[in-house]
């Protein structure tokens, strides 16, 4: 009964054709349920703080900085130990049904003297573990994209007209 109830919830919120494999034990389903509920509770805390009513699932030890500059879509999953930092001129905008893999970093800028531009992530995007997205020069990831593990993007605002000027 629990298995069918959880299937119905997953179908309604994430995947309308979802069905647990018959060989999945009930203990694994309970573990999934507890993990997702804990992630949702952590997400509610962030949603309340930023005044958003999106479903946000946060894994263990997720770090979020500059929350007032983040726009969350619905059904956003941020994996364990990931980091979101929205120090930028524009927002860190995360679309609907986005999954940020564990240990990933989505950081507009690390510089406080010349802050970065923005990061926009479209709907239905998935990131593998340990991905790094920087937004110093502005970064847009289109909808329905899949980004593999260890992917790294670092757009910058380099001055190419002066070859003697360092780019760091």
Stretch-by-stretch model annotation:
Residues 1-154:
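Domain-scale signature associated with acetyltransferase and cell-envelope carbohydrate enzymes
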Residues 164-168:
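Surface-exposed acidic, glycine/proline-enriched linker/cap segments
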Residues 153-162:
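Proline-centered turn/helix-capping motifs that create local helix->coil transitions or kinks
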């Amino acid at each position: 009964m629990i298995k069918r109830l959880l299937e119905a919830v997953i179908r309604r919120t994430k995947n309308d054709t979802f069905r647990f494999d018959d060989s999945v034990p009930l203990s694994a389903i309970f573990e999934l349920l507890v993990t997702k509920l804990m992630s949702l509770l952590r997400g509610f805390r962030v949603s309340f703080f930023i005044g958003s009513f999106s479903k946000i699932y946060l894994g263990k030890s997720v770090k979020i900085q500059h929350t007032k500059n983040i726009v969350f879509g619905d059904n956003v999953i941020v994996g364990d130990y990931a980091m979101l930092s929205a120090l930028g001129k524009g927002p860190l905008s995360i679309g609907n049904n986005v999954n940020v893999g564990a240990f990933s970093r989505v950081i507009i800028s690390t510089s406080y003297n010349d802050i970065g531009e923005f990061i926009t992530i479209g709907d239905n995007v998935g990131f593998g573990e340990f991905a790094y997205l920087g937004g110093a020069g502005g970064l847009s990831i289109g909808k329905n994209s899949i980004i593999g593990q260890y992917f790294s993007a670092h757009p910058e605002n380099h001055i190419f007209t002066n070859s003697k000027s360092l780019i760091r």
